[in-house]
């Protein structure tokens, strides 16, 4: 007669099976303090941040879509830009304004490039859900990309031409509200009073031009922005003046 002991599973796991990683409840806290205290290397910070973005992708996208829909319905600047885009036979709404996770891009020289959104003539606007802080941030990003869309419909912008791109970046940074004094003061710790708006627009336009792969370096980015600055900064269309 066979013993019932032979049917019991072994007490010791099979050593040939690959062991699964164990959940460490303290890892998040330790990583957070490492970043706060500056002991985590920058390359590890990027990996940690990207891992967190991937883990929370659905939450971030759902929240981004709520903020997008709210601004499409209630934001004066977004509604105004929607109307002016329609007047040029364009259409931007929830169907082609999409919230997506945007991974950090590492350049050949090791620099990190992050973005809040982007415009494509073929696909519409992408909002980087993992970079959006709140509804106001979504509003500014939407307005910025809508200026690009309006420029493209109005002037058929050649986005491969750095001068064309620089002009639209100047206008988008100036007209969207992202360079208003309150945002510079509270978000970016820029406490200057005089020339604050112009300095912000120039800085952000240079940064956007530099992020394009075909821009050689910051010297070229600054030169291109300076070449088109006067005419593009003073052009507030479709607004009568700088809105914010």
Swiss-Prot record:
Principal place of residence: mitochondrion
Residues engaged in binding a divalent metal cation: 144, 148
Membrane-protein topology: Peripheral membrane protein
One GO molecular-function entry: metal ion binding
Subcellular location: Mitochondrion inner membrane
Active-site residue list: 145
Positions of region (Disordered): 1-25
UniProt keywords, alphabetically: Hydrolase, Membrane, Metal-binding, Metalloprotease, Mitochondrion, Mitochondrion inner membrane, Protease
GO CC, alphabetical: mitochondrial inner membrane
Domain of life: Eukaryota
InterPro entries reported in the protein's UniProt record: Peptidase_M76_ATP23
Family: Belongs to the peptidase M76 family.
Protein name from the UniProt record: Mitochondrial inner membrane protease atp23
């Amino acid at each position: 007669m066979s013993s019932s002991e032979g049917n019991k599973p072994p007490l010791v796991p099979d050593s040939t099976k690959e062991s699964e990683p164990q959940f460490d409840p303290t890892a998040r806290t330790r990583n957070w303090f490492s970043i706060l205290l500056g002991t985590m290397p920058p390359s590890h910070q990027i990996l940690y941040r990207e891992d967190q973005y991937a883990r929370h992708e659905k939450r971030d996208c759902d929240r981004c879509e709520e903020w997008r829909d709210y601004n499409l319905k209630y934001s004066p600047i977004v509604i105004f830009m929607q109307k002016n885009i329609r007047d040029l036979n364009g259409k931007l709404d929830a169907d082609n304004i999409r919230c997506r996770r945007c991974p950090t891009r590492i350049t050949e020289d090791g620099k990190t490039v992050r973005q809040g959104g982007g415009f494509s003539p073929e696909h519409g606007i992408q909002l980087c859900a993992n970079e959006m802080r709140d509804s106001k941030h979504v509003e500014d990003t939407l307005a910025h990309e809508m200026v690009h869309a309006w420029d493209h419909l109005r002037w058929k912008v050649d986005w491969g031409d750095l001068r064309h791109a620089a002009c639209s970046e100047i206008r988008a940074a100036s007209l969207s509200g992202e360079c208003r004094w309150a945002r510079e003061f509270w978000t970016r710790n820029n406490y200057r009073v005089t020339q604050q708006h112009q300095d912000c627009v120039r800085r952000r336009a240079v940064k956007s031009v530099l992020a394009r792969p075909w821009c050689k370096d910051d010297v070229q980015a600054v030169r291109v922005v300076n070449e088109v600055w006067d005419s593009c900064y003073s052009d507030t269309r479709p607004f009568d003046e700088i809105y914010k």
